[in-house]
Amino acid sequence: MMHQIYSCSDENIEVFTTVIPSKVSSPARRRAKSSQHLLTKNVVIESDLYTHQPLELLPHRGDRRDPGDGRRFGRLQTARPPTAHPAKASARPVGISEPKTSNLCGNRAYGKSLIPPVPRISVKTSASASLEATAMGTEKGAVLMRGSRHLKKMTEEYPALPQGAEASLPLTGSASCGVPGILRKMWTRHKKKSEYVGATNSAFEAD
């Protein structure tokens, strides 16, 4: 027969086992006794492993956390130096995600990588004009036209502008995104330069 006595204190749980030998001892009973004895030893060893922490670090009764998690959390806190504040480790904001594609107009840094290259229709003008327009479209990745109204306005202001330079504009963009001031200056400078050089579109000239 085997009697187990449990004594619980503040620091750890101890299991005392008393084995009373019976008069008739068969080998099966001996095996059962030895296995039970080993079991109680394992219980004592495991309780010694987990009960060296102070009681303050264990979760309260009102907590819904798993007790295993509380033990791990307590061990992490004791291993940390006393100067480190536990709130500093969890200071990372949770609700912030990557910027979405709908917020492209206000964010120039992500405009380069998130706007896919769109095929453009370009008619040959002078070599410098077409190269400059293509470089502006690919490098900046920004919107250079607001729609048909913008095109009409440009043709009204600059009637000598060749049709090829208008056609080489990228076909991306929406009315909500405005043209940046630097790009607008570059574009007007390019138009004035093409007027002074006298670049003409040979594809639309009469033979």
Swiss-Prot record:
Annotated signal sequence range = none
Any one of the GO BP annotations = neurogenesis
The UniProt record lists the keyword Transport: no
Say where the protein is mainly found: membrane
Which superkingdom? Eukaryota
Q: Which UniProt keywords apply?
A: Cell membrane, Membrane, Neurogenesis, Nucleus
Chain spans, region Disordered: 55-102
Compositional bias annotation for Basic and acidic residues: 58-72
Where does this one sit in the cell? Cell membrane; Nucleus
Q: Which Pfam families match?
A: Vexin
List cellular component terms (GO).
Answer: nucleus; plasma membrane
The keyword Repeat appears for this protein: no
Identify its protein family: Belongs to the vexin family.
Q: Output the PANTHER family linked to this UniProt entry.
A: VEXIN
Q: What does this protein do?
A: Required for neurogenesis in the neural plate and retina. Strongly cooperates with neural bHLH factors to promote neurogenesis.
By what name is this protein known? Vexin
Task: Say which species the protein is native to.
Answer: Pongo abelii
